[in-house]
């Protein structure tokens, strides 16, 4: 907070290298809303929520930058990540505070993206938006019980499963037939698995046992793949002490041996969510070591 948090005119945001993006500000609000010290940071959380709404258009869509970079960017691509993150942040802030304005604005944005990403999925599909919008629609279903949100979760995650590798590196989310969706990446595997955990819970909640089984199978395959990317033994060729990378998850099995925080954190979040939905007994059967 002392390094990157800024506040101007009642708007709170993260600024890094002269830029401030919707996705980072959404993560800021999520962190504050989840904090056990929320009361201490309540004014900053309120400012961060206003910062997200400052990037909301009249039709409910979002803009990706509060402070734009000095280089060209693809706003539509960035929003496949940031829009769902912003929705989740606003809803989690509402759940924490009960301030209905943020629920209403999140619902308004959700309606835009239901049309953009779900009803028109054939024209606009990109897998990066699936997990964040899944989590957002799961929250909205819990709050409203509107069937359209459950149906959206199923539409998105049924489509996502087309990306999962079932023949070569089983469990990863990469299909060579659709290279436009990106190269294999453990962070993607983790966040897709996290989204599928919420989709699994939605299927269970609505009594759709066929989908629940399909999603759980995909989750378990993904966790096995992620486990294969985890550093569990010391590397003879590395000069780093083992504790520096033990348990870390490398980015992919091919060339990228670097570990990233989000490779591990999305996986942790997926396992925690699934454990909450399944219960501790079944959760104990997850891939050991993760």
Residue ranges and their predicted role:
Residues 1-290:
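Glycan-recognition and catalytic cores of secretory/periplasmic carbohydrate-active enzymes
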């Amino acid at each position: 907070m002392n390094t990157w948090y800024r506040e101007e005119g009642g708007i709170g945001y993260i600024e890094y290298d002269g830029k401030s993006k919707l996705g980072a500000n959404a993560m800021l609000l999520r962190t504050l809303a989840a904090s056990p010290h929320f009361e201490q940071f309540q004014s900053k959380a309120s400012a961060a929520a206003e910062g997200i709404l400052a990037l909301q258009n009249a039709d409910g869509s979002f803009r990706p930058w509060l402070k734009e970079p000095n280089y060209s960017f693809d706003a539509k691509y960035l929003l496949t990540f940031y829009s769902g993150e912003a929705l989740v942040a606003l809803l989690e802030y509402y759940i924490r505070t009960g301030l209905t304005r943020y629920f209403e604005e999140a619902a308004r944005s959700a309606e835009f993206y239901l049309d953009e990403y779900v009803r028109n999925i054939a024209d606009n599909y990109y897998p990066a938006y699936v997990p964040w919008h899944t989590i957002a629609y799961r929250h909205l279903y819990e709050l409203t019980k509107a069937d359209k949100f459950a149906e959206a979760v199923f539409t998105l995650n049924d489509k996502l499963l087309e990306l999962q590798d079932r023949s070569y590196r089983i469990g990863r989310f990469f299909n060579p037939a659709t290279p436009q969706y990106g190269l294999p990446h453990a962070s993607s595997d983790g966040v897709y698995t996290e989204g599928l955990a919420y989709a699994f819970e939605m299927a269970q909640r609505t009594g759709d046992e066929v989908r629940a089984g399909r999603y759980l199978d995909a989750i378990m395959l993904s966790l096995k793949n992620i486990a294969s990317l985890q550093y569990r033994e010391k590397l003879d060729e590395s000069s780093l002490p083992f504790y520096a990378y033990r348990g870390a998850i490398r980015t992919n099995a091919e060339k990228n041996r670097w570990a990233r925080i989000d490779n591990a954190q999305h996986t942790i979040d997926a396992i925690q969510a699934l454990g909450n939905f399944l219960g501790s007994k079944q959760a104990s059967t997850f891939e050991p070591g993760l």
